[in-house]
Amino acid sequence: AGKQALPDGNGGYRIIDYTAGVVTSPMTSGSVVKGASMLVAYNQGAIKIGEYQQDECIKLAGTKQKCSWKTLGRINDIDALALSSNVYQFKAAMKVAGYQYHYNMPFKVDKSTFDIYRNTFQEFGLGVQTGIDLPVESKGTSSDNTAGGLLLDFVMGQYDTYTPMQLSQYISTIANRGTRYQPHLLKEVHKATDDNSLGEVIYTFEANALNKVNTKEEYLDRVREGFHAVTTKSYGLGRNYIDASHDPSGKTGTSQSFTDSDGDGKIDTPTVSTAFIGYAPTDSPK
C-alpha cells in the first residue's frame, strides 16, 4: 500500500506515505514463500506430487518443538499449501538436507543446503533485485548463520526478508507459469512539443523476460493448483481474501518480527505481520 504506521507519542499511530518502502523496505513475509519452498522439494526429489506427510509437532535435539498453527494430521502437498502447513515444509527441508525426521534427532546443515533453496528463490525474484526502473532497490536481507533450525525458519518465510515488490514479482512469476518479468513504471517516451499535447512516441517499453524458473512444468502446475486451493477450497486459509467468482489463486502468510513501537529507537516490541499474494483469474491472470 506504500504506507507506514509510526508511533504518534500518545500510544497510537499515525499513517504516513511510504511509497518508496515498496522497493526499499524488506520484511519477513511468512508462509507466502511456501510455493517456492515446495518447488525446491519437488526439484530435489524430497517429495513427490501427491505425497502425504503427517503434520505433527516436531522436536530436534537442543531445540523447542516446532509446529504448524494447529495439528493438521495426514495431508498431501495440495493440502499443505491450502492449510499452510509448516511441518510439511519442515520434513521436506530435512530430506533436501539428507535427513529423515525422527524425534529429537540432531539436525545440522551447511551453506550448500541454504544455497539450494536460495538459488531457486532467486529465480522467482526473492533475494535479488527485481530490475524495476528506479535508482534504488533493496534485494532483501539474509544471514550466513546456517543452523539447522534456521533452515526450517527459512522454508516458512521466517528468516530471509523480501520487499513487497519482490513478493509481487514472485507471485507474478507463478502466474506466468515460471517466466520472471522485469517490473517497470515507464510505459513510453514521447517527443517534446511546443504545446501541451503529447508528441509522437519515440520509445516504448517492451516486456522484458529476465529468466525462466528451472523446474518441470508439472511441478509448477502443482504449486499453482495448491495456490488455487488456498482461495477456492472450503478449507483454504485464503478463501475470504478474494471473491471466489474471480477464480483467484494465492497464498496467505503470517510472520513474527520486532518493531520500535514507542519511538525510542529500539526495535524491541514483538509484532505480527500478515500478507497475501495472489492473482485472478487463475488460468488467464489480469
Regions found by a protein language model. Give the residues of each.
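Beta-lactam-recognizing serine transpeptidase/beta-lactamase-like catalytic domain environment
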Residues: 1-31, 36-286
